[in-house]
């Protein structure tokens, strides 16, 4: 979603919210939470407060009038009723064969509410230096997570990774084979952004950065000589990330056409651009997700940009057998998150079994 559209939608949602949600928004903006995260949270609050009005828990006329006391006095039974409402409301689910939203969606909703409650009961300060209230009903609400061993998760993910020669094969496919399948009109559209698309995908595969980190890169953040990019990690921390050498020609090809193709001015600082009505804009995450899905589905299997991050991490662990190195590359504080890659690269275990 383009930044301008995202901010417009955020403003519309903010106009609906109670004052304490607006305070929460400002507080999290200072952390900083990304606008995308805050937008998703505001959507969840809109859903929750709409239910509060519909269920009669509050007799306010509109969401913005719902008093803070409603959240303070919300019972565990009330919150469980909201969860049941989500499970049983079919219109919330695009798949009409299901009765309600998925458990993943419910967990996301509860996560947003937990964040709001934590702010109101622990983080915010009133004039006396105390939180607005102390009772946090969300601490009493259980969430159900999908039970799956690391080995099972690794096996599922492995099918959606471009390991070994498939990394370069994927890029070669986009560059050489994909255009041969296109109509003249589709080919013209493809050629307009070919170098940019290849540069983005090559960078994701060669660095393992998150999608948000990639789209927020500025031109000055790329050191092509050293093959290093400076990114803003989760929590606003700056980090320097090494980029594998195979991405260099794709980045060079894009930079060679960037200014002329996208009609840039000195004020256009974003590394990856898109043209909208003849005006260059920073490419948004949604556009990259669609692009990766399209190319990957044609090549092998439909994947998300996050699977390209998993691809880099798995290849790096396979080459080094170092969880510490992989953790540093991905920007993780501990090696626990990288345990997954030791299960994906399990040739030693399989070889041992084969020798029995």
Swiss-Prot record:
One of the Pfam families matching this protein, by short name: Phage_int_SAM_1
Q: Which gene encodes it?
A: xerS
Q: Which residues form the active site?
A: 210, 234, 306, 309, 332, 341 (o-(3'-phospho-dna)-tyrosine intermediate)
- Kindly list the GO molecular function terms attached to this UniProt entry: DNA binding; site-specific recombinase activity; tyrosine-based site-specific recombinase activity
- Alphabetically list the UniProt keywords: Cell cycle, Cell division, Chromosome partition, Cytoplasm, DNA integration, DNA recombination, DNA-binding
Q: Which family does it belong to?
A: Belongs to the 'phage' integrase family. XerS subfamily.
Q: What is this protein called?
A: Tyrosine recombinase XerS
- Any keyword Cytoplasm? yes
Q: Which top-rank group of organisms is this from?
A: Bacteria
Q: Does the keyword Translocase apply?
A: no
Alphabetical GO CC annotations of the entry are:
cytoplasm
Per the entry, what this protein does is:
Site-specific tyrosine recombinase, which acts by catalyzing the cutting and rejoining of the recombining DNA molecules. Essential to convert dimers of the bacterial chromosome into monomers to permit their segregation at cell division. Required for resolution of chromosome dimers frequently formed by transformation.
GO BP terms: namely: cell division; chromosome segregation; DNA recombination
> Where would I find the Core-binding (CB) domain in this sequence?
16-121
Domain named Tyr recombinase is located at: 169-354
Cite the source lineage: Bacteria, Bacillati, Bacillota, Bacilli, Lactobacillales
Q: Where in the cell is it found?
A: Cytoplasm
Q: What more does the record tell us?
A: In contrast to the XerC-XerD complex present in non-streptococcaceae bacteria, XerS acts as a single recombinase required to recombine difSL recombination site.
């Amino acid at each position: 979603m383009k930044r301008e559209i995202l901010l417009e939608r955020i403003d519309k949602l903010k106009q609906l919210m109670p004052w304490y949600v607006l305070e929460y928004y400002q507080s999290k903006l200072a952390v900083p939470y990304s606008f995308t995260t805050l937008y998703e949270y505001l959507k969840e609050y809109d859903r929750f407060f709409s239910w509060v009005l519909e269920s009669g828990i509050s007799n306010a006329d509109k969401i913005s009038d719902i008093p803070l006391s409603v959240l303070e006095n919300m019972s565990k039974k009330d919150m469980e009723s909201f969860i049941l409402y989500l499970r049983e409301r079919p219109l919330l689910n695009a798949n009409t064969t299901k009765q309600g939203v998925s458990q993943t969606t419910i967990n996301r909703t509860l996560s947003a509410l937990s964040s709001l409650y934590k702010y109101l009961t622990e983080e915010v300060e009133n004039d006396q230096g105390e939180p607005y209230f102390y009772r946090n009903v969300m601490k009493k609400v259980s969430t159900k997570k999908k039970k799956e061993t690391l080995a099972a998760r690794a096996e599922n993910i492995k099918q959606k990774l471009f390991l070994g020669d498939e990394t370069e094969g994927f890029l070669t496919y986009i560059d050489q084979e994909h255009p041969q399948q296109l109509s003249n009109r589709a080919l013209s559209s493809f050629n307009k952004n070919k170098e940019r698309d290849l540069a983005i995908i090559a960078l994701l595969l060669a660095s393992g950065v998150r999608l948000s980190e990639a789209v927020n890169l500025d031109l000055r953040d790329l050191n092509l000589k050293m093959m290093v990019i400076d990114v803003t990690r989760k929590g606003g921390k700056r980090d320097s990330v090494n980029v594998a050498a195979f991405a260099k020609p794709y980045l060079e090809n894009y930079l060679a056409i960037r200014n002329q193709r996208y009609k840039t001015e000195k004020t256009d600082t974003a590394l990856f651009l898109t043209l909208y009505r003849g005006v260059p804009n920073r490419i948004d995450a949604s556009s990259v997700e669609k692009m990766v899905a399209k190319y990957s589905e044609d090549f092998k299997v439909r994947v998300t940009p996050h699977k390209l991050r998993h691809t880099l991490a798995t290849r790096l662990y396979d080459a080094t057998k170092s969880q510490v190195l992989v953790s540093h590359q991905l920007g993780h504080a501990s090696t626990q998150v990288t345990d997954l890659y030791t299960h994906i690269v399990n040739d030693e275990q399989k070889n041992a079994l084969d020798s029995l």
